[in-house]
Amino acid sequence: MTERIALFPGSFDPFTKGHLDTVERASRLFDRVIIAVMTNAAKKPLFDGPTKVALIETVIADLDNVSVVAQPKTLTANFAQAVGARYLIRGIRNANDFEYERDIAALNQTQDAQLETVLLLAKQEFSFISSSMVKEIAAFGGQVDQLVPPAVAVALQEKLKHGRD
């Protein structure tokens, strides 16, 4: 039987509890899940790629079939082919996410017709969390403990504290 490999691409800036829930659920559906920290040219990241990879590795340490890689400046479909992934994992929080992901899935199909996008609906308790909002809350000194894993919360506090100095 062919190994079912899924790719979970994203900028993960920062990695949230919603991302973690999506990865945990995907890890039960697939033989292997690769989290790909991608470069989004439209976003200005708070954390660099190696820092994001290190944080995510800490958070997912107990998930034996999940790994993390930094893959800057490449098309997701091309990277999926390079690592043998036939599935893309995407978390959906709302109708806007669905519309966006449907269009991206169609574009990915133009690059690789065999690449399937699997949409996982966010659990209610994570449906309002976005990395952008987490950064904004943290930047103004708000509490992010309920929104991100503990290691990420600490890294956010440290990064923003040093960024203000």
Curated annotation (Swiss-Prot):
Q: Which residues are tagged with the site Transition state stabilizer?
A: 19
For this protein, the record's SUPFAM superfamilies field holds:
Nucleotidylyl transferase
The broad enzyme category this protein falls into is: transferase
Which positions are annotated as binding substrate? 11, 43, 76, 90
Q: In which domain of life is the source organism classified?
A: Bacteria
For molecular function, the Gene Ontology terms on record are: ATP binding; pantetheine-phosphate adenylyltransferase activity
Q: What GO biological process, any one, is recorded here?
A: coenzyme A biosynthetic process
The EC number of this protein is 2.7.7.3
One cellular-component annotation, GO: cytoplasm
Note the InterPro entries from the entry: Cyt_trans-like, PPAT, Rossmann-like_a/b/a_fold
Provide the residue positions that the database annotates as binding ATP: 11-12, 19, 91-93, 101, 126-132
Q: Which cofactor does it need?
A: Mg(2+)
Q: Does the keyword NAD apply?
A: no
Where found in the cell? Answer: Cytoplasm
Recorded catalytic reaction(s): these are: (R)-4'-phosphopantetheine + ATP + H(+) = 3'-dephospho-CoA + diphosphate
* Pathway of action: Cofactor biosynthesis; coenzyme A biosynthesis; CoA from (R)-pantothenate: step 4/5
Xref: Pfam families: CTP_transf_like
Q: Which UniProt keywords apply?
A: ATP-binding, Coenzyme A biosynthesis, Cytoplasm, Magnesium, Nucleotide-binding, Nucleotidyltransferase, Transferase
* ATP-binding in keyword set: yes
Q: Which family does it belong to?
A: Belongs to the bacterial CoaD family.
NCBIfam families associated with the record: coaD_prev_kdtB (TIGR01510), cyt_tran_rel (TIGR00125)
Physiological role? Reversibly transfers an adenylyl group from ATP to 4'-phosphopantetheine, yielding dephospho-CoA (dPCoA) and pyrophosphate.
The subunit structure is:
Homohexamer.
Protein name (database record): Phosphopantetheine adenylyltransferase
Give the source species.
Latilactobacillus sakei subsp. sakei (strain 23K)
